[in-house]
């Protein structure tokens, strides 16, 4: 299990200050929509300057026609990030096209597919997909696995079933982690680190419980200490 810290603060200055405070730890850093749209490639470079061993997850959730997604995936690969994601809803052709485009890279980033956003509850998910979260997430995961992706973004509650349906090596990255049972905020399907471990999560994503803590570095130390016991 490897910790992924969500850099979701309102400004580059705040996000970089958080990263600076964590530079002693070779954790993953999640860069999302707001940070990347606002701060772009220089922000990625600034993170790597703080700690070259930070691994960067670019959380842009690509969702478009296959060739457009593949074009974007190639540009992402050129940024030197370590992982990015696409929407599984884009379908098998899009997945295959993206992976074929990246096959020429000697060291390509990991590619994950988003199954069901953790902000969904069962009722709202069914209104869109006409199936339950568990069933559809597993279907999306099998499609992703069959088309050569490295893993999926899902909630902790789908992780074990997804690995059983695909492979133990098929990665699960799970937002909505409240390490010690902190407030859920706008997330619907949240879990503690202990549960994430039981459900074989590879990458727990933690944001607010870290950056809203009075001592973010201390919180990360607590989290890493707990992970080391698993």
From Swiss-Prot:
Q: What is its EC number?
A: 4.1.1.23
Any GO molecular function: orotidine-5'-phosphate decarboxylase activity
**What is its pathway?**
Pyrimidine metabolism; UMP biosynthesis via de novo pathway; UMP from orotate: step 2/2
What does it catalyze? orotidine 5'-phosphate + H(+) = UMP + CO2
The record's listing under InterPro entries reads: Aldolase_TIM, OMPdecase, OMPdecase_AS, OMPdecase_bac, OMPdeCOase_dom, RibuloseP-bd_barrel
Q: Where is the active site?
A: 61 (proton donor)
> A Gene Ontology biological process annotation?
'de novo' pyrimidine nucleobase biosynthetic process
Q: Which CDD domains match?
A: OMP_decarboxylase_like (cd04725)
Q: Which Gene3D superfamilies match?
A: Aldolase class I (3.20.20.70)
Q: Which domain of life is it from?
A: Bacteria
Q: Could you give one GO CC term from the UniProt record?
A: cytosol
- Extract the SMART domains matched here: OMPdecase
Q: Which residues bind substrate?
A: 8, 30, 59-68, 118, 178, 187, 207-208
* Keywords in alphabetical order: Decarboxylase, Lyase, Pyrimidine biosynthesis
Assembly and partners are described as: Homodimer.
* Cited function: Catalyzes the decarboxylation of orotidine 5'-monophosphate (OMP) to uridine 5'-monophosphate (UMP).
HAMAP family, per this entry?
OMPdecase_type1_B
Q: Which family does the record claim for this protein?
A: Belongs to the OMP decarboxylase family. Type 1 subfamily.
> Which protein is depicted?
Orotidine 5'-phosphate decarboxylase
Q: Which organism is it from?
A: Sulfurovum sp. (strain NBC37-1)
Gene behind this protein? pyrF
